[in-house]
Amino acid sequence: MRQKRVLSVLLILLFLVSQAKGQDYKYLESTGAASGISLSAGIENPVSVKVIYDNYVKVEGMKEDWGYSIYIEGLDKEILFDTGTKPEVFESNFKKLGIDADKIDFLILSHEHGDHTGGIPAFVKMRKGIPVIIPQSFSEKFKKEMSGSGLVPLLVSKPAMICNNLWTSGEFEYQIPEQTLVLNTKKGLVVMTGCSHPGIIEMLKKIRTDFNRNIYMVFGGFHLMQKSDKEMDTIITEMKALGVVKCGATHCTGDRQIKMFREAFGDNYFELGVGNTLVIH
């Protein structure tokens, strides 16, 4: 009897250890800065970015809500970057924009917050079985939820090519793990952000170092709502010093801060907002 109890305890311990280790996940093949990132001359054809989810609306009839999601087409793969907050809002805007879910090759998540991942239940009703590219430090709970939803978690740690001329920045080391998308164009790099929790300037500096190319354009959420005008002046100056020519700020950037970017970049500033389409050459 005692032996049976000991055996039962051992089996339970083995089970707990196996659960603690978690599932083995595949990684997107990395190309770290140390080994050198090889870039082509840049995109040959225009790349289109449609705003699906944002707390600003650009086109009448679309729904606005706190969160962010964009759809990228014109490359050799089609990309969904983040999914916003509410499944019903995501699905409504997605369908009104006429996006074909069956053509999407990758779902990529900037970070684990609900205003970027909340629309996943609506998305997996339309598209399953594709990779969801996430920073390696996402919680084990979230990874399991993705596997259970019908998506295939693909982890990133360092810069890695997603498809021709499109890269992930890799995971930024910060209390909130985050990645950005980096598009290679003939004019320079285009950086697409989710929330920029690690700091927009710190992120841009690392990307410029890792990719050894100037940053031509940056857009997305910059998470600057608490920044003073003086701090904003410094951020804008540093951004321009990094080579940024064109800029579009939205989502968590802050209304006052967006106005300052708009004024600082003038004709080189572009609006985002639900329903808007940005064409990158």
Predicted features along the sequence, with ranges:
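Zn-dependent metallo-beta-lactamase
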Residues: 19-75, 158-171
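Conserved beta-strand hairpin/beta-sheet module of binuclear metal-dependent hydrolase folds
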Residues: 49-96, 178-193
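Cap/insert and terminal regions of metallo-dependent hydrolase folds
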Residues: 119, 189, 195-276
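Metallo-beta-lactamase
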Residues: 134-179, 185-186, 240, 270-281
